[in-house]
Amino acid sequence: MLHQPKKIDDRFIYTDKRRRYVSFPLGGIGTGSVSLTGSGRLIDWSIRNRPAIDQFNGYSHFAIKAEQDGKLLNALVLNGPYEGTPTGSPSARKFDGFGFGANRDSLAGVPHFDDATFVGRFPVAELEFHDASFPGQVQLTAFSPFIPHNDRDSSMPVALFAISVENDTNAPIDYTIALTLGNYGCDSGIHTFTQQNELSILHFTSADTGYPERRGDLAIITNGEDVEHVDYHFRGQWFDSLGLHWREFARAGRLRERRYDKPRATTNMFQQPEHGTVAVRARLAPGEMRQVRFAISWNYPLGSIYWFNRDQPGSPSFEGRPPTWKNYYATQWTDSVASGTDAYKRWDALEAQTVAFRDSIFGSSLPSEIIDAVNGTLGILRSATLIRLEGGEIWGWEGQHIHEGSCEGSCTHVWNYQQALANLFPALERTLRETEFSYNQLPSGGLTFRQRLPLGSGFDIIGPCADGHFGAIIKAYREWKNLGDNAWLQRYWPHIRRAIEYAWSPDNPDKWDPDKTGVLWGRQHHTLDMELFGPNSWLTTMYLAALTAASIMANAMSDPAFAKECHDIAAKGSAYVDRELFNGRYYAQKLDLSDRSALTPFDQGRKAGVLRDSFMDAYWSDEYGEIKYQIAEGCLTDQILGQWHADIAGLGDLLSPENVRTALISVFNENYRPSLRDHFNPCRVYAYENEAGLLLCTWPDGTTKPALPAPYAEEVWSGLEYMMASHLIQRGLVDEGLTIVRAARARHDGSRRNPWNDIECGSYYVRALSSYALVNAYSGLWFDQRCGEIGFKPARAGDGVYFWSAGRGWGVVELKGSTVTLIVKGGDLTVSNLRMPGLSGAATVDGQAVRRNGDLILLGKHHTLRAGDRLVVEVDAYGQA
């Protein structure tokens, strides 16, 4: 394998049963993706502005053949064993799918390697192929650029493949390595082979005359010295195309060129696209190794609202076809040739930076389960869950159905949890704040939680949700703190202020906090897709964190009266939550479930959550005499979600630290199950039998579970597991936190689920990007660009190396003895102070004495560090307090 800084942990090596569900996404942020399976198949071709889970692009594949003295030694598809269902998967088409055998496009029926070993360390995948009958050793490395703070190069619509072949025999061998690609989604292709300097390019365009948003192009690019090309595979019916291609490939000699002057008149009876092949020949002496590179690039420039429902109340109206928008990548590269050649020409630099990021994570002192959680979820950023709009803005689904997105609109009560963009690509995260304040804010100040496309085309009809609404304010503070730009805050401060005031506004129909008590009392929509009523710590702590953040921002915006008002309201609310909602073990909801009158102020005709029932029918049960879908005395995993956000943003304690710690321990003790075999779950099943997991909510002994509790309560969500684990680690409960992470990752080991696809309400579910909080929780990263301060307090004492990404740069910090070395590997970082708890004695920076104020080392000036720079701090002694 290439690029191995140290021995690879076995958990990242996938063989045999653990290889079965591996599907590793390749592509850029907002470009869609294609995935590489654990056996080397190209699948999940989600590149045409919508998901295509478990879908092939015709019979696209890599293949290799070996010849000697004009005779064929062997020819194999560059795949390992077929691991799909032998009877076929369900399909909407007749004469296809279940009951019709293994998918033909998987090439299960074409000779391939006996075995394969997959190594997945995001953003790089590596495969070794094994077959005693093949003369040579074959490896494949695949990646797409993924470089923190470099969002342009990380948004390239490309997948890059390097195939290495070693002749391990005692005689010369002629090898041919070929890439066959289908002209995806095209009925009648136009394939053009050109050479640009050292690059050979097969460009796939279309003669189709359908709607503009369905058009696009792809390219194969290589720089091999001896290149062969088959512009078109045979146009025929039945199995002619693949049959003749393999017949012509699996024989000695060069490939037969084939061109057609006219577009295809009739489509294949099995709806196969047209195909083309580019191959590189190389003669290798005994013991010689050669690497051949291929780029696959794509360009489907226009997105459209394919999911649009004209009959949905509150939806914008339009005539004719749904509106379209241009993808960001299409504003940067004119077509697939432009993006592919750009990536190819800069391959070495892009790979070096991508591998540097990978090695900084995998070479760190983070526990392997945390590395695995981050490794397994960052691929969501390059999946079809994300769209990057023409101006560079991020817009997202919650997850993905097989052929379309799941739950549109950058849903704030789900996107609240993801922490990856804010740390690795903060400029992209800021676009989420900017668009929600610019396009989601109602005249009343409320923030709707789903964003319509195109931007500015209307509001979601459900209105604000409490967790998402206050999350926007907390995260605006986080973005300002990490950016350090008062002008940015000033631009959005009027929106933030109005959002805070919405809590007590008479125009708020949900009557959250009309008396400014610091507690949410009214109707509170939330991420369980229904509403809570009455005081509860979950949503009130979100309110408290938002009030605390608003108080600080108001002072910075020269609004001291509002700052004091927010501070005082928060103080009252905090006292109430600790006094009235903490039961000695955890925080609960305060509501008399038998009091029907608690609902009557909110029976105003607006629908209940996601239900179509009338409000009272949705929330009141005559049979049980009880308000439905509440938490009541339950121990909710999310019960102090606002404190988690506050800890991440550096807002301090919202509640009693002792109570917070006790509540976190209770969540672990009550909600974590080492085995779910005896657990009853009538909801969606994301963990089962002997698997371990953290439940959303439980009702401990001595409490009463509502007859009809909050939806999903019995489920296990990995996004909540990562959140809770990081919060436990933040608060010093490291073993408990790691136990939860291990459980989540054990379920995603490849044998039952894809390690790179955490599911919830669909595939590549964005809540799972809460996993990135584990990185900062364990390293104890503290960063505030406003004062140029960075610091670390690792969860475990002793020497270590930790990844960081902050400001406009990223790198590692090395802690060794009494020496702290801050290393920048990409971007730049401007710092004035270094905070390291546990310091004692004198301090020097790069050999020069500096002042120290407790845990804070005062560097004396702004230090701007760029890639390759390091800051070395020596102290008399260092050990975490």
Sequence positions of predicted segments:
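Substrate-binding groove/exosite segments of carbohydrate-active enzymes
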Residues: 12-57, 256-275, 281, 288, ...
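Acidic-aromatic substrate-binding/catalytic surfaces of carbohydrate-active enzymes
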Residues: 29-105, 208-257, 327-330, 334-337
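Primarily extracytoplasmic ectodomains and periplasmic/lumenal surface modules that are beta-strand-rich
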Residues: 29-33, 39-44, 71, 170-174, ...
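Acidic/polar, glycine-enriched structural segments that form the non-catalytic walls/loops
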Residues: 1-8, 13-16, 22, 126, ...
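Non-catalytic C-terminal accessory modules of carbohydrate-active enzymes
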Residues: 41-43, 49-53, 57-72, 76-77, ...
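Carbohydrate-active enzyme catalytic cores, enriched for enzymes
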Residues: 554-557, 569-677, 766-847, 851-856, ...
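Hydrophobic, small-residue-rich alpha-helical packing segments that form membrane-like cores
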Residues: 517-557, 565-576
